[in-house]
Amino acid sequence: MGSDQDIDRPDEPNREPTEGESHSWAVEALRSDLRGRPRPEPAEPERQEGRIPQTRIGRSAKLGTAIGGQATRYAGTAAANVVRSDEKAQERLETRHIETALKMASTLGEMKGAAMKIGQMASFIDVDFLPPEYREIYQKQLSKLRTHAPAMPWERVRMVLEEEYDERPESVFASIEEEAFAAASIGQVHRATLHDGSKVAVKIQYPGVADALESDVANMGILLRLARALAPGLDAKAVASELRERVLEELDYEFEAQNQRTFARAYEGHPFIFVPKVHSRLSRRRVLVTDYVEGRRFDEVKELEQDERDIFGEIVFRFCFGSIYHLQHFNADTHPGNYLLMEDGRVAFLDFGMTKRLTTQQIQLEQRAMDAAGRDDPEGLREALHDLGFVADTSRVDAERLMEHVKMVGGWYLEDKQTEITPKLVMRMIEVTSDPRSDFFDLVRKESLPADELMGRRMETGLLAVLAQLRATANWHRIMREWVYADPPSTVLGEAEWRYFERRGIGQTPGLPSRV
């Protein structure tokens, strides 16, 4: 639930502006943040009063205005600045971008669903629709979609509780706070106390969000069909079906509870990974109740010393990839709001609404592909990617260029060396796979994205972006070898984890014969 638990408390100083605070205060607050100055006194916050827009046309138009409209405003302001003095032009341009960032965050926050997820991703992944020189302004404002998006009024979400429990919330909980402490893309979270005194987090699904997500998925289907013009090998129908299936699962909190129970059992007592316990008796299709977790949010972790950020990054890396090999199951929703650094040094992993299970055969094919790339075997790599579904016709794809392309994208864990993950590195990887100007774009047009691989690539992209925000450094290759070849642990954390899984009797997918 963690994007759902990670939020500033109302009484904390220097909190981010919330929806409804005065426009001028919000602009000056963000400007002060960027320049390291104290903020002005905040205005009184308000809640989101309106309903979530639900129709396909309505949501598509609103999303287009939020994202596409800013490009038009950017161009117009830049043109007008030609006739102004440099200093005044710079100030006006900065103000325009601050206003646009505020509007974008507000609109995406009100829309919830997939639209809000786009905003969350843009807050930590460098994307093309944000002007590079003003990206910090947008990312700082959009980051509140991970931590404190506009919450719905208690009266509206209370109705969901009453419908799901068929009784008053006051009968179910000893107490429940009417003020949400977190608001995410599909639901918001309230602190509560059970009758036995246990502190819990109660995630309540927004009324109307199911219809909104149905519209988002339909709009995504249209975009995927258009994407075939750029990537003819893309099976748009299969990818759209996979997206729809994962979204429907995310809407079912009982399914999420089942996922979270699986991970919580597997990592119970783990030395550095923590997954909160689910209260199954109180969880419903639109209500999820878990143990409440305290911890430092990602923005605070980013300010820690390098060695602490490296440890945090390795823990996230081991959770994201390690669960594939130990559980044949991974969490695809890798964004910074889903991680909390606990007081004892463990990292709490939250929100299991979007996960993916893999077969032994799928994992072994991935191992084959990584092995071929690591051994510099172009023919073997092409064959492995063909078996995975990335290359439909091997005769149309040059094996040497394919190897070069794969090393550009996966070099960070294919090369046996210490590698710092930076935003520039991640942007370069994204460009070689999606930019029509890339030297490899003709190759990309001959490749495909198998529906079964969609969530894996989503996880990997999100993980990379998280590591880039941390500027985490490690020999990612040596850690990966622990799973691909069943090599001995390569770090102190790896040794602790190996002892844990051995003690618990949790094995992993058999590794390939080790090749050094």
What is each PLM-predicted segment?
Residues 337-341:
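Hydrophobic residue at the +6 position relative to the catalytic HRD Asp in the kinase catalytic loop
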Residues 326-336:
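Catalytic-loop of the protein kinase fold
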Residues 1-321, 342-348, 354-356, 360, ...:
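Broad phosphate/nucleotide-binding scaffolds in NTP-utilizing and phosphate-metabolizing enzymes
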Residues 363:
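Short adenine-binding "F-helix/F-box" segment of the Bergerat
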